[in-house]
Amino acid sequence: MAWIDPEVTKKPKKPMFLCVLSNTKTAHIPKLSAAGKTAELTDYTPAGDAELIETGNIISVPVLPMTPPYDTPTPAIMTRSALKLTEAPYHFINSGLIVTPEVPCIDLKAKPGEDIREPIAVRDVQGIYERAKFLAKRLRSQIDHVVIGESIPGGTTTAMGVLNALGYNGNVSSSADENPLELKKQVVEEGMKASGLTFGSLKDEPMKAIACMGDPMMPAVIGLVAGFQGTEVDVVLAGGTQMAAVYAIIKHLGFNTEKLAIATTRYVVEDKSAHFVELTKTLEVPVVYIADPGFGKSSLKGLHRYETGTIKEGAGAGGAMYLAGLFGVTQDEFRSEVENVCKLLKAGQ
């Protein structure tokens, strides 16, 4: 298959990449998220991703975001490479960070998400949504195509929680080699109980599903999508099961989804422990773009770990690659740039 499937041909005149950075204390649960060397270090992952995408290295965070045990470099290396090759404009959006990066961020004044086993996981959902919607309205005259990514450790568990609350079965993907699905199911079960929910009980109250079982990335992305509604701006949600959960909320809110698509990596689609493809079919997502960076051909062992499913997606990597494809970047050109980024970081060796 082409490195972006289905192949993209229409090059936008005014594209933009947005990356929502958030934290949820759900990621502090041991062995739940691999988006950091330890559960505590996941607090730094979104900030580290932003610094790496912006500067090519980390500035304020103590350690480069990597996935153990092979120190597979963060998907942010792909996002940086794609944005560097395309020179597309981009912004980072702080929606509930514990640690803020030393690079410019648009602040939505959101608090970090709580552990979903608490009765309230996200406070001020409506406020975050409205501020993000206002931001999109300010941006929409400047663009005709927007790709929205995310960086939030623990986000696949909150995605599972929201999907359950809305009435969708299905496993979610993971940042780990071995997807801790049983642990995720247990955490979601405890969260549903703490909030007095049952499967599908919030299908008519999607914003409450975020408040009880979600994370602060969700209302930010949904608010952005709301702000682009009714315009000629094409919106691509960059991510795997997390963005499928966001799409589910959007659908339950009754938004027009004709100009919406999802872009993710081949590694999410091929994850046998998750049901991403089935979920997107159930949700009737108009288009799902699949990006394949071809890391099996790389000389760097750390990049080979992507091919084995050690790490799959994050920091809008799939959407950033989709954007690179729109600009005519080839798979070989892209992989070469990723290798350059890794060598400068001394990562993935």
UniProtKB/Swiss-Prot annotation:
Gene3D superfamilies: 3.40.50.10210. It comes from the Archaea. GO terms for molecular function: nicotinate-nucleotide-dimethylbenzimidazole phosphoribosyltransferase activity. InterPro entries: Nict_dMeBzImd_PRibTrfase (IPR003200), Nict_dMeBzImd_PRibTrfase_arc (IPR002805), Nict_dMeBzImd_PRibTrfase_sf (IPR036087). SUPFAM superfamilies: Nicotinate mononucleotide:5,6-dimethylbenzimidazole phosphoribosyltransferase (CobT) (SSF52733). Transmembrane segments: none annotated. Disulfide bonds: none annotated. Belongs to the UPF0284 family. This is UPF0284 protein MA_3887. It comes from Methanosarcina acetivorans (strain ATCC 35395 / DSM 2834 / JCM 12185 / C2A).
